[in-house]
């Protein structure tokens, strides 16, 4: 049998001429959808059993087909050259051709009642469900690294910023757990996308449904789905679950990029808050002193590629009429690439963070900046009945005067402060300490040591719940 005949096997009888060789290479998807071979074999086995139950195959024929599929799957795992040399149009064509070569006419019966349209919609959903589980496992490892660093640095202070300007003091553990909260939401978002994928389109045919007596619910159960699709036309063209998974990956990548940005800044000499591990850093071919945060920079850079995958599929989908269109073939490479990149980014982030050494001396020294307790000065006035807006204005004037006099607010004498408000007294000094500023933020979610300790325990409890769900 010629290559061209093989290429046309699933649909070629209506045509007089073979496909142009350049067009065939352009349109064939085997080179990337071969990744769906495990899902293809699982679907084919379930379909063979379903049509045997429906009387389309005898029990013996169904068993023969399942046995042949098992043998082909075993070969596919042990013979990569077989896969690499294939000229199949797609993953469905590859398996059907091999099955017919093995079983003859019996192998040709397997496609009864189904279409590549409902097959690929089903297999892609199966893939997304497993991919989501893989990403959530990786996120759990990143959350572990965050929890361990937070425990190790539980009471280490640091300057908190807004607009990249010193704002109020924080605990380093509070900063770490802030990132942890974002990643935990990512795990939930990925799970929600997988939930949307947990609907079985198989039995929808090309667009109008299946004409043979099959139990779709039993088929869905065999393939690990929780329900069946409600409308065959929608089922073969729906890629919402793909977009949702790509959106979840894009949001995850955005959170990774923000974590990376913090680390790049904190590792710079101007900050010096963290020593990056040698094994996740690189040097310069010219400047021997350099230790570059390439792990974090690459995480930041790869985020754009994941955004691109999401936008590419949005643009592909926006102009499609109802039902399946060949444009939908473009969904898979976008998702495969985004999944692979996101998975690698999470693994590298977890490993780099776990091996990083935070410099308590630099963090503590930076947290002593008197400007960080300016809010404490206003709060102090409020405790004596001064309205906050008035207190804010008083402290603003104090800060302006201190700057003009070349002093910090801690260096301003009580007598000088009383010129701005008679409320100031000698108990003020204790209110302006770093320890006091941290301790006063004791409500749940705050940066006081006790609040952060409680938050860490709750974070670990939710992490355990995530892991038990995998």
Regions found by a protein language model. Give the residues of each.
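A helix-coil-helix interface module used to build multimeric assemblies
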Residues: 2-209, 214-221, 282-283, 294, ...
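Glycine-rich cofactor/substrate-binding loops
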Residues: 2-43, 105-106, 272, 287-470
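Short runs of predominantly hydrophobic/aromatic residues within well-ordered alpha helices
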Residues: 44, 92, 96, 242-245, ...
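Short, well-ordered beta-strand elements within core beta-sheets of diverse protein domains
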Residues: 49-57, 127, 174, 243-251, ...
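Helix N-cap/coil-helix junction residues
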Residues: 56-57, 225, 386, 407
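Charged, flexible cofactor/metal-binding loops and thiol motifs
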Residues: 124-129, 136, 151, 158-319, ...
